[in-house]
Swiss-Prot record:
Residues annotated for substrate binding in this entry: R21, H137, T358
Name of the protein this chain belongs to: 8-amino-7-oxononanoate synthase
Organism: Burkholderia cenocepacia (strain ATCC BAA-245 / DSM 16553 / LMG 16656 / NCTC 13227 / J2315 / CF5610)
Keywords assigned: Biotin biosynthesis, Pyridoxal phosphate, Transferase
Record carries keyword Magnesium: no
SUPFAM superfamilies reported for this sequence: PLP-dependent transferases
UniProt function note: Catalyzes the decarboxylative condensation of pimeloyl-[acyl-carrier protein] and L-alanine to produce 8-amino-7-oxononanoate (AON), [acyl-carrier protein], and carbon dioxide.
Residue list for modification N6-(pyridoxal phosphate)lysine: K242
GO biological process terms, semicolon-separated: biotin biosynthetic process
Family: Belongs to the class-II pyridoxal-phosphate-dependent aminotransferase family. BioF subfamily.
Name of the encoding gene: bioF
Annotated catalysed reactions: 6-carboxyhexanoyl-[ACP] + L-alanine + H(+) = (8S)-8-amino-7-oxononanoate + holo-[ACP] + CO2
A single GO molecular function term of this UniProt record: 8-amino-7-oxononanoate synthase activity
Length: 394
């Protein structure tokens, strides 16, 4: 059988299981109301939690950065591509989100995937043991595989099981790895307990705050700040394409850890740096996030979250107990979830169906992603359509 035959058979299998993914094409900027595939829709699919992706100040900063630095970086960070905009942003990020460390330093990456690969592969290797939450993001899992470290997976958020694994470990280097906000459930990791376990066992804790940075904590400083945690054993990863509304990611840790990543993280060294204009726009985003406007947007988002939690409890399906902008509604089968998605789409609402392998088999779900850009009128449309779809499925 040829490769094409094998691939075609695999695609047919995906179709039969209701698992083929289809891209939609946005014709306008990411916002609550968009034109997608030529239709006006209200989107509940993006990770633009603060509604900053089309913010005029960020758009202007992006254009200003392109005028000043050009359209591309021209090289890797170590070979000519590291601009003043990148360096300034790293200093700003360390000051903004590095309060957990006495000597924080930040390192900017082009994507969150690359940042997580860097943390896993450069900090762990043969002889090390990584203790991973069962629901960690795919980028962390891929990084663990590439690291060649021993990986032990503990049940989701089960700190007792994690403690038992740590007690039994004789590894010299131990890394506990966890998302902060889990992207498909919306729940928050038991961070205080994880920090305590790391310190008790001489381990390091690596947290991926992709869905918390900009939203959680005072001024949006993230999940660690929300829990008022400080520790010399922390490595903090955050992304800049979700609440921050631009692109890229970062790692913040003790300055020695960051210097090691610069020297040894292959996903940092062997790739072209992101355009400086992107970093320039992120600097503008941080000003909005940390200011009064950021506080107002987080307050509006919090109100939407509470309304959505109440709404999901009134459907026939199973809501997940989430207090974040990620509001899942577990339906079960792939076909039923796709049918619910199509019913909402008929009302001009884009609420994506999340299916295996992203979530376990039998737990396919709608994932309502909320944004400060949503109005209460947008929520009312979602409420009416979701109740109708739920009743029709009964």
């Amino acid at each position: 059988m040829s490769l094409l035959d094998t691939l075609q058979r695999g695609l047919a299998d995906l179709d039969a299981q209701g698992l083929r993914r289809v891209r939609r094409i946005a014709d306008t900027a990411c916002d609550a109301r968009m034109t997608v595939n030529g239709r006006e829709i209200v989107g509940f699919a993006s990770n633009d939690y603060l509604g900053l992706a089309a913010h005029p100040a960020l758009v202007a900063a992006f254009a200003e950065g392109a005028q000043r630095y050009g359209s591309g970086s021209g090289g890797s960070h170590l070979l000519g591509g590291h601009s003043r905009a990148h360096a300034r942003l790293e200093d700003e990020l360390a000051g903004f989100a590095g309060g957990f460390s006495d000597a924080p330093r930040a390192l900017y990456f082009s994507t969150g995937y690359m940042a997580n690969l860097a943390a896993m592969t450069a900090l762990a290797g043969k002889g090390a043991t990584i203790f991973s939450d069962a629901l960690n993001h795919a980028s962390l899992i891929d990084g663990m595989r590439l690291s060649r470290a021993n990986v032990q997976v503990y049940p989701h958020a089960d700190t007792a099981a994690l403690a038992a694994l740590l007690d039994a470990s004789e590894a010299e280097t131990k890394l506990i790895v966890s998302d902060t906000v889990f992207s498909m459930d919306g729940d928050v990791a038991p961070l205080a307990e994880l920090v305590a376990l790391a310190e008790r066992h001489g381990a390091w804790l690596v947290v991926d705050d992709a869905h918390g940075f900009g939203v959680l904590g005072p001024q949006g400083r993230g999940a660690l700040a929300a829990a008022a945690l400080r520790s010399p054993h922390l490595v903090y990863v955050g992304t800049l394409g979700k609440a921050a509304g631009v692109a890229g990611a970062f790692v913040i840790a003790h300055e020695t850890v960051i210097e090691w990543l610069i020297q040894r993280a292959r996903s940092y060294i062997f790739t072209t740096a992101a355009p400086p204009a992107v970093a320039h726009a992120v600097s503008a985003s941080l000003k909005v996030i940390a200011g009064d406007e950021g506080d107002a947007r987080r307050a509006h988002l919090a109100a939407l979250i509470e309304r959505t939690r109440a709404l999901l409890r009134n459907t026939r399906w199973q809501p997940v107990d989430s207090h974040t902008a990620v509001q899942p509604l577990v339906i079960g089968s792939n076909d039923a979830t796709l049918a619910a998605m199509r019913a909402l789409d008929a009302h001009g609402l884009w609420v994506p169906a999340i299916r295996p392998p992203t979530v376990p088999a039998g737990t396919s779900r709608l994932r309502v992603s909320l944004s400060a850009a949503h109005s209460f009128d947008d929520f009312a449309r979602l409420e009416a359509a979701l109740i109708e779809a739920s009743e029709a499925a009964a």
